[in-house]
């Protein structure tokens, strides 16, 4: 099982997030409190890239000068940097601060030195707009200086990849809180993420050294994908994991793509767009789906596209039925089910309304009937109240399978676990229940 120390972002992570958010002191007056994240989030991404690349700065500069005459030099520069990204600018944060008068033009030169995949991330976050604002307001030099402090060191030696993900989520949560976002825009605690990962992998990964795919339809900063990959590799160190995710928030999407670049994955698998109306993974099937989609948020904007796809029946994702336009969470559930391989498994967070909303024969009722009659529901776990930032709703973790390995004898047995009193939930707490269910099923199998 996962080391409990890995599950706790820890005091150091909180302190690092505090240091980065304290840059707001340099922004006060020029920016309103709910706008601080527009600067702090992309600057944190830039500084993380900078600190990762700093040890190979001289090597990249040498390689860049040697290969300047070549039209195609990407591979050489990536090899020199040690990452799937690089920066060819002559500047570092340290040398930027040596010329306060030209901080604006020099900082832009530094950002333009990044490889295209990094510049795409920054463009998605509209960072150039904030550079212009800071330059005009006279705070750009101070902000760069703040991020260059020893306490803001985000090199891999100081901040591990997973810990950096926790820091990013902490910053996003503060940004969201300052915006006073809707209850459906929530963030998932590590305990719940690891519970989901542990239950998804409770039966192992199958053949040793297998290749597994993981998909999150509302990935946020992609921490569910990261945790799931780590969990799979703890179960089988030789497993090959490929992550896929879609996100509609440009800031969290930028962070997710940056995280994937730093981890050495394929950033093209992180795709920007509205999952309901613009499915970027149409036709894809995955081994695992893990997600905490928004709930209590209407889908009126996506209605035209969703209804058009629903009219396709079995050829689309939503042919079974449509929920009320006031809450689109069941649409995400249907999307997830449509993305499962025959032996795939999904863990998805829903609030209680998906269990009882709608009269008999209504869209929600037909969705539930479709899932139950196909025996795709494996378990429902009620989570503690106040499990999520910015919402006090009662929530459930639903486990779905497309086709259990034991489908030939497993007949319509889904489980409901009541865990509203659990604090700090994890697989150690849940395992006795899971083992009991497995033992019961094994006994039933012998009797058949």
Question: Model regions: which residues?
Answer:
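A generic secondary-structure signal for well-formed alpha-helical elements
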Residues: 47-60, 175, 232, 264, ...
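Conserved S-adenosyl-L-methionine
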Residues: 183-291, 295-307, 330, 351-353, ...
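Non-catalytic, mostly N-terminal accessory regions of nucleic-acid modification and defense proteins
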Residues: 1-204, 269-277, 382-385, 414, ...
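Short, flexible loop/turn elements at secondary-structure junctions
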Residues: 45, 221, 247-250, 387, ...
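A conserved structural/catalytic subdomain of Rossmann-like adenosyl-cofactor enzymes
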Residues: 2-7, 11, 279, 283-448
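A short, mixed-charge helix-start or loop-turn motif at secondary-structure junctions
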Residues: 178, 238-239, 317-319
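Soluble or luminal CAZymes and related metallo-dependent hydrolases
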Residues: 15, 19, 248, 328
């Amino acid at each position: 099982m996962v080391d409990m120390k890995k599950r706790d972002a820890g005091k150091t992570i909180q302190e690092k997030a505090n240091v980065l958010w304290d840059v707001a002191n340099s922004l006060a007056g020029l920016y309103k409190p709910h706008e601080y994240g527009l600067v702090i989030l992309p600057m944190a991404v830039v500084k993380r890239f900078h600190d990762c690349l700093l040890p190979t700065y001289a090597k990249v500069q040498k390689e860049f000068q040697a290969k300047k005459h070549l039209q195609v030099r990407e591979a050489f520069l990536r090899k020199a940097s040690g990452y799937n990204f690089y920066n060819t600018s002559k500047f570092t944060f340290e040398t930027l601060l040596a010329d306060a008068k030209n901080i604006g033009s020099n900082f832009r030169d530094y950002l333009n030195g990044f490889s295209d995949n990094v510049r795409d991330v920054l463009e998605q976050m509209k960072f150039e707009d904030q550079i212009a604002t800071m330059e005009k307001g006279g705070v750009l030099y101070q902000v760069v200086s703040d991020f260059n402090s020893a306490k803001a060191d985000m090199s891999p030696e100081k901040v591990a990849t997973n810990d950096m993900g926790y820091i990013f989520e902490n910053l996003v949560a503060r940004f969201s809180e300052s915006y006073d976002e809707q209850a459906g825009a929530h963030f998932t605690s590590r305990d719940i993420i690891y519970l989901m990962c542990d239950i998804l992998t409770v039966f192992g990964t199958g053949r040793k050294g297998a290749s597994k795919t993981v998909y999150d339809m509302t990935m946020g900063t992609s921490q569910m994908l990261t945790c799931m990959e780590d969990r799979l590799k703890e179960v089988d160190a030789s497993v090959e994991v490929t992550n896929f995710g879609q996100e509609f928030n440009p800031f969290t999407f930028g962070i997710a793509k940056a995280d994937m670049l730093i981890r050495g994955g394929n950033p093209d698998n992180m795709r920007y767009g509205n999952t309901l109306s613009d499915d970027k993974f149409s036709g894809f099937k995955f081994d695992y789906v893990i997600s905490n989609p928004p709930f209590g948020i209407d889908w009126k904007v996506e209605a035209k596209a969703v209804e058009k796809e629903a009219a396709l029946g079995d050829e689309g994702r939503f042919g079974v039925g449509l929920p009320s336009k006031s809450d689109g969470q069941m649409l995400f559930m249907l999307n997830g089910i449509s993305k499962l391989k025959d032996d795939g498994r999904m863990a998805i967070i829903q609030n209680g309304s998906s269990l009882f909303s709608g009269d008999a024969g209504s869209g929600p009722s037909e969705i539930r009937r479709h899932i139950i009659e196909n025996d795709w529901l494996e378990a429902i776990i009620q989570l503690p109240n106040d499990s999520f930032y910015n919402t006090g709703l009662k929530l459930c973790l639903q486990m779905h399978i497309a086709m259990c390995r034991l489908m030939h004898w497993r007949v319509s047995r889904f489980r409901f676990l009541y865990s509203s009193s659990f604090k700090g939930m994890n697989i150690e707490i849940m395992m006795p229940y899971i083992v009991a269910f497995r033992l019961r099923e094994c006994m039933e199998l012998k009797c058949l």
